[in-house]
UniProtKB/Swiss-Prot annotation:
SMART domains: EFG_C, EFG_IV. Catalyzes the GTP-dependent ribosomal translocation step during translation elongation. During this step, the ribosome changes from the pre-translocational (PRE) to the post-translocational (POST) state as the newly formed A-site-bound peptidyl-tRNA and P-site-bound deacylated tRNA move to the P and E sites, respectively. Catalyzes the coordinated movement of the two tRNA molecules, the mRNA and conformational changes in the ribosome. GTP binds at residues 17-24, 88-92, 142-145. It comes from Teredinibacter turnerae (strain ATCC 39867 / T7901). Belongs to the TRAFAC class translation factor GTPase superfamily. Classic translation factor GTPase family. EF-G/EF-2 subfamily. One of its GO terms (biological process) is ribosome disassembly. One of its GO terms (cellular component) is cytoplasm. This is Elongation factor G. Its main location: cytoplasm. It is found in: Cytoplasm. InterPro entries: EFG_II (IPR041095), EFG_III (IPR009022), EFG_III/V (IPR035647), EFG_IV (IPR047872), EFG_V (IPR035649), EFG_V-like (IPR000640), EFTu-like_2 (IPR004161), G_TR_CS (IPR031157). CDD domains: EF-G (cd01886), EFG_III (cd16262), EFG_mtEFG1_IV (cd01434), EFG_mtEFG_C (cd03713), EFG_mtEFG_II (cd04088). Residues 8-290 form the tr-type G domain.
């Protein structure tokens, strides 16, 4: 089958934003203008096409990133038809993992900001993640019709808070109720969209006289930014003081792709203004798959690094970036094709798991409807139905051309709760449901507590777990009770100690004998999970076949902790002496001896309890400021700064997670629902002694 759209006309983009910046509405409008969606879905009515899970529609926030394909040839049909694959990403901080996954497979991103609240804490998180994956991006300042909206203030925030070289390509005409349209600074014309046909048509007009001077100044800055793209443009600009419109576009494109500048556009998706021009900018300034760095991976030896280019003739390689369970077809595995092509019915290799997968049916998604396809080519994003062993982050490649593409890193969960099925019938269903949810979401973990036999689920925040329990009820019809949230405490030693571990058992016949001296010290990276183990034994005082057992004894004891039963972080252990018995020594005896030595860290290692500290940002009306700060102080919070934005005062604080349970409800009642907050994991810090004693005592009595 021949390629319908040349790869140079593909755009794989993500639309990222803070919770209320209006990202879903923006995506909806994109689908409307590109002709796929006939009635515009409003999030206010809970009917947006992209938000396809019931909870998303109720809560009005996007949880799963659905991938959608649409086509666009420009507001005035001035381009050849381009294929735009949009990955919708969630904006809530509990779902940062989804954003990270999406950014991994995108080539470019549109960051949507709210014209009045501007750069929010979640924006900073998304921005950092986009920097990590070097994703070229542009900004769409949405909600220009909102009270307090100010386009140029948001441009300043981009520079100050995110350190971005923001270059406006437009200026908004009016704001709040007076928002009329935008000025295109390249053409120096006003664009006014027609409200009667929901913005499908528009007029170009002269720039309002009172804005002319400001627009000329902004244009000058934009032309300067474009001229810095290369020497040729710079020379022309210095000689003539001007560039042609095509040269400006070329310069801005080059610098956007190089991640040197961030073009900024404005509009109001809700009022059908500006999204059409934003789509044009996606085509003009964001990269095709062939214009980003070729993806790298490792070959079968696990060391040699190879590249795969966006080319249909190269061997097939793809990355699975999302698993979703669909009530009608079962498991959908979303994947991005980096190189080569694939027909349905072909067998592939999952190189991470080392297992074969047969691709039966493939579909391409439009928000919540799907089209079955027979073939995918380089640059495509599609979903395969019924893969058995593939999970998020796995590589799929041609059987004869092994490669493992760069893996994704997933954060450790910070909050756990016990779940208990309400009836015997729910018990079995709950196991299946939790298994499926964990397969879809790598930041969600399920385990059974060995001592209590309870099922414990862990995730990135209260909202994250609420939604998963909610999905269990709706999608899998499992009724469950939720226990009190448990905090993921950790332990760490603070001083160096040399400890003897000796395990001797004589009981007639063959005995047991293991004897070690171990130096324990805090590792350089105090938050490192896992053990840094050094063997300094000389002269075989402990035979080398027992050394792995010593390491295992220490690391198993690390998992169970030494003070209160929580895993130890940042431990370095060096075995430097010991002794053995020709007959009685064995691996088990040395493992127990090492474990006994590790347990003694409670007395000798200055072991302390660590608690997760959260970075909390509260936006509150001024009159509630005192209550909010007082409440955070009561929760052992450390106020780190105060700021203000149009939506009110902003309080930044670091607060222990243990004190943040139920905070959403408390904040709502203290401020009549006018304040909002976001919270994300910051670091582990030593718990105050009174708190630590309480937790240790609780764990000893086994409450």
């Amino acid at each position: 089958m021949a390629r319908k759209t040349p790869i140079a006309r593909y755009r794989n983009i993500g639309i990222c934003a803070h919770v209320d910046a209006g990202k879903t509405t923006t995506t909806e409008r994109v689908l409307f203008y590109t002709g796929l969606s006939h009635k515009i879905g409003e999030v206010h009515d809970g009917a947006a096409t992209m938000d396809w899970m019931e909870q998303e529609q109720e809560r009005g926030i996007t949880i799963t990133s659905a991938a959608t394909t649409c086509f666009w040839a420009g507001m005035e049909q001035q381009f050849d038809q381009h294929r735009i694959n949009i990955i919708d990403t969630p904006g809530h901080v509990d779902f940062t993992i989804e954003v990270e996954r999406s950014l991994r497979v995108l080539d470019g991103a549109v960051v949507v900001l709210c014209g009045s609240s501007g750069v929010q804490p979640q924006t900073e998180t998304v921005w950092r993640q986009a920097n990590k994956y070097e994703v070229p991006r542009m900004v769409f300042v949405n909600k220009m019709d909102r009270a307090g909206a100010n386009f140029l203030r948001v441009v300043e925030q981009l520079k100050d808070r995110l350190g971005a070289t923001a270059v406006p390509l437009q200026m908004t005409i009016g704001s709040e109720d007076e928002f009329k349209g935008i000025v295109d600074l390249i053409e120096m014309k006003a664009i006014l969209w027609n409200e009667a046909d929901q913005g499908m048509t528009f007029d170009r007009a002269d720039i309002p006289a009172d804005m002319l001077e400001e627009c000329e100044e902004l244009r000058e800055q934009m032309v300067e930014a474009a001229a810095e793209a290369n020497e040729e443009l710079m020379e022309k600009y210095l000689e003539e003081g001007e560039l042609t419109n095509d040269e400006i576009k070329k310069g801005i494109r080059l610098r956007t792709l190089a991640n040197e500048i961030v073009p900024v556009l404005g509009g109001s998706a809700f009022k059908n203004k500006g999204v059409q021009a934003m789509l044009d900018a996606v085509i003009e300034y964001l990269p095709a798959p062939t214009e980003v760095k070729a993806i790298q991976g490792t070959l079968e030896d696990g060391e040699t690094v190879a590249e795969r280019h966006a080319d249909d003739t190269e061997p097939f390689s793809a990355l699975a970036f999302k698993i979703a369970t669909d009530p009608f077809v079962g498991t959908l595995t979303f994947f991005r094709v980096y190189s080569g092509k694939l027909e349905s019915g072909t067998a592939l290799l999952n190189s991470v798991k080392g297992k074969k997968e047969r691709i039966g049916r493939m579909v391409q998604m439009h928000a919540n409807s799907r089209e079955e396809i027979k073939e995918v080519l380089a640059g495509d994003i599609a979903a395969a139905i019924g893969l058995k062993d593939t999970t998020t982050g796995d590589t799929l490649c041609a059987e004869n051309s092994f490669i493992v593409l760069e893996r994704m890193e997933f954060p450790e969960p910070v909050i756990s709760v016990a779940v208990e099925p309400k009836s015997k019938a729910d018990q079995e269903k709950m196991g299946i449901a939790l298994g499926k949810l964990a397969q879809e979401d790598p930041s969600f973990r399920v385990r059974t507590d060995e001592e209590t036999g309870q099922t414990i689920i862990s995730g990135m925040g209260e909202l994250h777990l609420d939604i998963l329990v909610d999905r269990m009820r709706r999608e899998f019809k499992v009724e469950a009770n939720i226990g009190k949230p448990q905090v993921a405490y950790r332990e760490r030693i603070t001083k160096t100690s040399e400890i003897e571990g000796k395990f001797v058992r004589q009981s007639g016949g063959r005995g047991q004998f293991g004897h070690v001296w171990i130096r324990f010290e805090p590792a350089e990276d105090g938050d490192a999970e896992g053990l840094e183990f050094v063997n300094e034994i000389v002269g075989g005082v402990v035979p080398k076949e027992y050394i792995p057992a010593v390491e295992k004894g220490i690391s198993e004891q690390m998992q169970n902790g030494v003070v209160a039963g929580y895993p130890l972080l940042g431990l370095k252990a060096t075995i430097y002496d010991g002794s053995y018995h020709d007959v009685d020594s064995n691996e088990m005896a040395f493992k127990i001896a090492a474990s006994m030595a590790t347990k003694k860290l409670a007395q000798h290692g200055g072991a302390v309890l660590l608690e997760p500290m959260m970075k909390v940002e509260v936006v509150t009306p001024e009159e509630n400021m005192g209550d909010v700060v007082g409440d955070l102080n009561r929760r052992r919070g450390l106020i780190q700064g105060m700021d203000e934005n149009p939506s009110g005062k902003v309080v930044n604080a670091e607060v222990p997670l243990a004190e943040m349970f139920g905070y959403a409800t408390a904040l709502r009642s203290a401020t009549q629902g006018r304040a909002t907050f976001t919270m994300e994991f910051e670091r582990y810090a030593e718990a105050p002694s009174n708190i630590a004693e309480e937790i240790i005592a609780k764990n000893k009595t086994g409450e």
